[in-house]
Amino acid sequence: MKSAIMAVASAAPGLRGPSAFNGAALTTSAKSSSAMKMSFESEIGAQAPLGFWDPLGLLEDADQDAFERLRYVEVKLGRIAMLAIAGHLTQQNARLPGMLSNSANLSFADMPNGVAALSKIPPGGLAQIFGFIGFLELAVMKNVEGSFPGDFTLGGNPFASSWDAMSAETQASKRAIELNNGRAAQMGILALMVHEELNNKPYVINDLLGASYNFN
């Protein structure tokens, strides 16, 4: 009995060792995660009015690579949304001349604006759109390695001289402005789509100001 007690006692430090080690590792990991999150709070985009805003906790255990991947996606979606807003407004006020599809007897002037256009585009036209998007994804929208997320100037930048002439502070300000505009555009194009589906009146500001317009 005595020998059994001695055996258990001698094993006890070994049993405590891994537990103590794991606790230290967890503490270190938590500190590391907290420090990483604090570094994200000073990144471009963590700005007024929301500051650092991560309601889904996507950055809780993220490293720098994960953050830059998310930022890359955000920048790209923001640019697409800004183009979508510009396209929506352009299509509302002007149309290309001529035919969109001779086989379908469909002119550009006959095309509705907004989401409704998807139901009118011939299959061949949709195939061209998706093919072009695929080409951009695979061959054009490639981030310059070692540069900031969203730098797609692999094929050269015609504005390189003016960009390089800017100070680091000015470049950071320009990138922050683009992020804010992209975020606003994502909310804007979503609002246009929602209001189009609700009552076919997407331009809420026009409605508030009493400015009439014909949509589709």
Curated annotation (Swiss-Prot):
It is found in: Plastid, Chloroplast thylakoid membrane. Keywords: Chlorophyll, Chloroplast, Chromophore, Light-harvesting polypeptide, Membrane, Photosynthesis, Photosystem II, Plastid, Thylakoid, Transit peptide, Transmembrane, Transmembrane helix. Gene3D superfamilies: Chlorophyll a/b binding protein domain (1.10.3460.10). One of its GO terms (cellular component) is chloroplast thylakoid membrane. It comes from the Eukaryota. The lineage of its organism: Eukaryota, Sar, Stramenopiles, Ochrophyta, PX clade. The keyword Membrane applies. Belongs to the fucoxanthin chlorophyll protein family. The light-harvesting complex (LHC) functions as a light receptor, it captures and delivers excitation energy to photosystems with which it is closely associated. Energy is transferred from the carotenoid and chlorophyll C (or B) to chlorophyll A and the photosynthetic reaction centers where it is used to synthesize ATP and reducing power. GO terms for molecular function: chlorophyll binding. Pfam families: Chloroa_b-bind. The LHC complex of chromophytic algae is composed of fucoxanthin, chlorophyll A and C bound non-covalently by fucoxanthin chlorophyll proteins (FCPs). The ratio of pigments in this LHC is; fucoxanthin: chlorophyll C: chlorophyll A; (0.6-1): (0.1-0.3): (1). It is a multi-pass membrane protein. GO terms for biological process: photosynthesis, light harvesting. This is Fucoxanthin-chlorophyll a-c binding protein C, chloroplastic. Induction: Levels are increased twofold when transferred from high intensity to low intensity blue or white light. Residues 1-38 form a transit peptide. The chain crosses the membrane at residues 80-100, 121-141, 182-202.
